[in-house]
Amino acid sequence: MSGFEQLFPGTLPRLVMFDLDGTLIDSVPDLAAAVDRMLLELGRPPAGLEAVRHWVGNGAQVLVRRALAGGIDHADVDDALAEQALALFMDAYAESHELTVVYPGVRDTLRWLRKQGVEMALITNKPERFVGPLLDQMKIGNFFRWIIGGDTLPQKKPDPAALLFVMQMAGVTPQQSLFVGDSRSDVQAAKAAGVQCVGLTYGYNHGRPIDAESPSLVIDDLRALLPGCADPATGITLADLQASQDRESTVAVTGKFWMKVIKALARWRWRA
């Protein structure tokens, strides 16, 4: 039985919201290269790929502080040093995303959802300045009606603000929505928003298995969500998905756009 058949018996969600890093794309190689360049410029030894893999998922500021601390706990990192290091990291990461790749099954799943008329949104803790260019490079940006970066709203995941915002914009309820991610922050945000969450085993969760966070469903491949997508009897095959060239309009939610719609969110209580 597919993931959708388990979570939405007899129907489909009206809205599917996705995390980005560790869910749709493997960006750790480029992030690690930027972290190591930052550390070298500060006269420190590089951290390496596997260390960075355990540190990502909570935004650039936290990643930089973890790199300076050499671990998950970064409370003792000097704020001035962290600010200097963040600028170095942002400059380094902006230069190249050549090592970033889309995970297998992602494009098939996005095409299938679009063919079914399911609205899609992207909610990431990655700074918004990187999100649009990266999505364009990966050729998946046109699938998403709403795109929210980590510094778009006053809060980032695990706060549910972005999920609540997108559901309000889409005019759907939590019961009609699904969030797909790979980390504790994703699961916590979904639960706080009252939304079912699918956890992916291949992503970044600080070295912890995603099932330890108790998402609604755990899968190894996004295509496990799709009911019979490779079964010709359904009339929808992977060949159909790959041939689809339709494009949807996309709303990239920037900081300026946020100021225009903040009044519409007044009924939500922002958590400190």
Curated annotation (Swiss-Prot):
One of its GO terms (biological process) is glycolate biosynthetic process. Pfam families: HAD_2 (PF13419). Mg(2+) binds at residues 19, 21, 182. One of its GO terms (molecular function) is metal ion binding. It is an enzyme of class 3 (hydrolase). SUPFAM superfamilies: HAD-like (SSF56784). It comes from Pseudomonas putida (strain ATCC 47054 / DSM 6125 / CFBP 8728 / NCIMB 11950 / KT2440). Pathway: Organic acid metabolism; glycolate biosynthesis; glycolate from 2-phosphoglycolate: step 1/1. Its cofactor is Mg(2+). Keywords: Carbohydrate metabolism, Hydrolase, Magnesium, Metal-binding. Its EC number is 3.1.3.18. The keyword Electron transport does not apply. One of its GO terms (cellular component) is cytosol. This is Phosphoglycolate phosphatase. Belongs to the HAD-like hydrolase superfamily. CbbY/CbbZ/Gph/YieH family. The lineage of its organism: Bacteria, Pseudomonadati, Pseudomonadota, Gammaproteobacteria, Pseudomonadales. The active site is at 19 (nucleophile). It comes from the Bacteria.
